[in-house]
C-alpha cells in the first residue's frame, strides 16, 4: 500500500486550489480571465477524484477496520487531532463526493454567468469539507467539517439561487444551525466524561455513560442528523433550498449533504448509544414511514419539477432511516446502498431539470410537454433516471429499497407494508412527471426550437445513467465493499 498521505491529499488539494485561486490568480493580471480559474478548478477536481479512486482500488474490503489512517496532533488540550481514515461505510461516500463535485464543476463552466471564480471556490470548499467529514475518526474534527459545509452551501443558494434565494438560504442555515447546537452540547458532555474525541476509543466506553444521560445524548445527536437527512418534522427547509438553489447546488445538496445525516447515524449515533438506539428505534421507524407516505403524497401535488424531486428525496431518505434502525444486516446494507443510489439518481434528475431550465427558464411542469420529440437523448436519459427513482428491478433504486424493506420486515411487518405503499406512490408521481414533460403534443411554441443535449450536458449526465444501470445489475460489487463494516457495526445489536 502506498505510504502517501492519500486522504490528506484528497482533503487538502481542493483547499490548496482555493488558496491559489484567491491569492495568485486574483492578484495577477489574469484575474479578469475566468478561464484560468476554470482550469485550476477542473484540474483540482480531476486530481481529487483520481486520489479517491486510488483509495477505493487499494481498499481491502476483507478488513472492517479503518484503513489509510493518518493521525497528527493538533490541539491536545481540547482533544482535537487530525485523525482520518476510511472503512467500508465511508469509502464509497468519499468517491461519490469527488465524482459529483467534478460533474458539477464541469457543468458550471457553461451555465454560471456571474461570479464564476467565487462559485467554483465554494464547490471546492464543499468538496474538501465533505471528504473531511466522511473520513474523520475524531468526533470534534467530524463536527468541524460537518458544520463548515454550511457556509459554502449557504453562499451558493443565497448568491446564485432563484428569486426567493435569500429566504431559502436563511432557512437552510437556521435549521442546520439549530441541529448543530444540540450536537455541540453533546460533544461537550462526551469530552467531560471520556476526555477524548477518538471515535474508536469512545465507543469502547459507552457503558460508562449513565442510561438517562445516554437518552438525552441520543436525542440531541439524533436531532442534529435528522435535520440533515431530513426526517419529518425537520424537513421544511429542503424543498425551498432545492427550488431556489442553482442546478449544481441541488446536485451537491441531494447527492452528498443529505447523506451526511444518514452517515452520522451510522458513524456516531448507533455506536455511541446502542441500547438507547434500540429503545427509541420504533419512534424513528414510524417517523420514517410517515415521511415516506406524506412526502410521496405531497410530491403528487407539486407543479414545480424541482420541488417534486425534493419531496421524493424526503421519501427516499425515509427508506434509509427504516433500514438503519432495523439493526439488521439487510436493512443497514440497504440503507447505505439507498444513500449511494439516491445520490446518483437525484443528481441525475436535477441535472436533467437543469438542462430544461436552461432552455425555457421555468421549472413549472405545465409549461412543458412533447419535449421528447425534440430531445430524444434527454428523453432516454430521463426515462432511465425516472425508472431508477421508482425502483425498477435492474436499476440501482430497486436494490436499496428492497434490502431496506427486507430488513424492517424482520422487526416490524406493519411498517413494512405501509412503507411499501410509498413505492407505488413514487411510481405514480414520477410517471406523471415524465408523461407531462416529455410526452404528448407540444403546446409551448418555444419547445419547437429546443436543441438536444450539448456535449457538456451529455458528459455530465451519461456517467450517472451508467451508474444507475451498473449499480442495478452488479449490486454485489458495491455491497461487498461495506459488508464486513456493517457486520462490525451491528456487533452490539
Swiss-Prot record:
The chain crosses the membrane at residues 5-25, 37-57, 89-109, 115-135, 139-159, 172-192, 216-236, 251-271, 280-300, 308-328, 334-354, 375-395, 411-431, 458-478. One of its GO terms (cellular component) is plasma membrane. One of its GO terms (molecular function) is ubiquinone binding. It is found in: Cell membrane. The keyword Glycoprotein does not apply. It is a multi-pass membrane protein. NDH-1 shuttles electrons from NADH, via FMN and iron-sulfur (Fe-S) centers, to quinones in the respiratory chain. Couples the redox reaction to proton translocation (for every two electrons transferred, four hydrogen ions are translocated across the cytoplasmic membrane), and thus conserves the redox energy in a proton gradient. This is NADH-quinone oxidoreductase subunit M. It comes from Rickettsia conorii (strain ATCC VR-613 / Malish 7).
Amino acid at each position: 500500500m502506498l505510504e502517501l498521505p492519500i486522504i490528506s491529499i484528497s482533503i487538502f488539494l481542493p483547499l490548496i486550489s482555493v488558496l491559489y485561486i484567491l491569492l495568485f490568480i486574483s492578484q495577477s493580471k489574469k484575474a479578469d480571465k475566468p478561464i484560468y480559474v476554470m482550469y485550476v478548478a477542473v484540474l483540482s477536481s480531476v486530481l481529487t477524484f483520481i486520489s479517491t479512486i486510488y483509495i477505493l482500488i487499494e481498499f481491502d474490503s476483507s478488513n472492517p477496520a479503518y484503513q489509510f489512517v493518518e493521525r497528527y496532533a493538533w490541539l491536545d488540550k481540547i482533544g482535537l487531532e487530525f485523525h482520518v481514515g476510511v472503512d467500508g461505510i465511508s469509502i464509497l461516500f468519499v468517491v461519490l463526493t469527488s465524482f459529483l463535485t467534478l460533474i458539477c464543476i464541469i457543468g458550471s463552466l457553461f451555465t454560471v454567468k456571474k461570479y464564476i471564480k467565487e462559485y467554483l471556490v465554494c464547490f471546492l470548499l464543499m468538496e474538501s469539507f465533505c471528504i473531511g467529514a466522511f473520513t474523520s475518526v475524531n468526533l470534534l474534527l467530524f463536527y468541524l467539517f460537518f458544520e463548515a459545509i454550511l457556509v459554502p452551501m449557504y453562499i451558493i443558494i443565497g448568491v446564485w439561487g432563484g428569486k426567493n434565494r435569500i429566504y431559502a438560504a436563511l432557512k437552510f442555515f437556521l435549521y442546520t444551525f439549530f441541529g448543530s447546537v444540540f450536537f455541540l452540547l453533546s460533544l461537550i458532555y462526551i469530552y467531560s466524561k471520556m476526555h477524548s474525541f477518538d471515535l474508536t476509543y469512545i465507543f469502547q466506553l459507552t457503558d460508562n455513560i449513565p442510561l438517562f444521560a445516554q437518552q438525552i445524548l441520543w436525542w440531541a445527536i439524533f436531532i442534529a442528523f435528522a435535520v440533515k437527512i431530513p426526517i419529518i418534522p425537520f424537513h421544511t427547509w429542503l424543498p425551498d433550498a432545492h427550488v431556489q438553489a442553482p442546478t449544481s447546488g441541488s446536485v451537491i445538496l441531494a447527492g452528498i449533504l443529505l447523506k451526511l445525516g444518514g452517515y452520522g447515524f451510522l458513524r456516531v449515533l448507533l455506536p455511541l448509544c446502542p441500547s438507547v438506539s434500540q429503545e427509541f428505534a420504533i419512534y424513528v421507524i414510524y417517523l420514517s414511514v410517515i415521511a415516506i407516505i406524506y412526502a410521496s403524497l405531497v410530491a403528487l401535488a407539486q407543479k414545480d419539477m424541482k420541488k417534486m424531486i425534493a419531496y421524493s428525496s424526503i421519501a427516499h431518505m425515509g427508506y434509509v432511516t427504516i433500514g438503519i434502525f432495523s439493526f439488521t444486516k439487510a436493512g443497514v446494507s440497504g440503507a447505505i446502498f439507498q444513500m449511494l443510489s439516491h445520490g446518483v439518481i437525484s443528481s441525475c434528475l436535477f441535472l436533467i431539470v437543469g438542462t430544461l431550465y436552461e432552455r425555457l427558464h421555468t421549472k413549472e411542469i405545465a409549461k412543458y410537454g412533447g419535449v421528447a420529440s425534440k430531445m430524444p437523448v434527454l428523453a432516454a436519459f430521463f426515462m432511465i433516471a425516472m425508472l431508477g427513482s421508482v425502483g425498477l428491478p435492474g436499476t440501482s433504486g430497486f436494490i436499496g429499497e428492497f434490502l431496506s424493506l427486507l430488513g424492517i420486515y424482520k422487526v416490524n411487518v406493519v411498517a413494512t407494508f405501509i412503507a411499501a405503499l410509498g413505492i407505488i406512490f413514487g411510481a405514480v408521481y414520477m410517471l406523471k412527471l415524465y408523461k407531462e414533460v416529455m410526452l404528448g403534443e407540444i403546446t409551448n411554441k418555444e419547445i419547437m426550437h429546443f436543441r438536444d443535449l450539448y456535449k457538456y450536458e451529455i458528459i455530465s449526465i451519461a456517467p450517472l445513467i451508467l451508474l444507475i444501470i451498473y449499480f442495478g445489475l452488479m449490486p454485489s460489487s458495491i455491497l461487498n465493499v461495506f459488508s464486513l463494516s456493517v457486520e462490525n457495526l451491528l456487533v452490539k445489536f
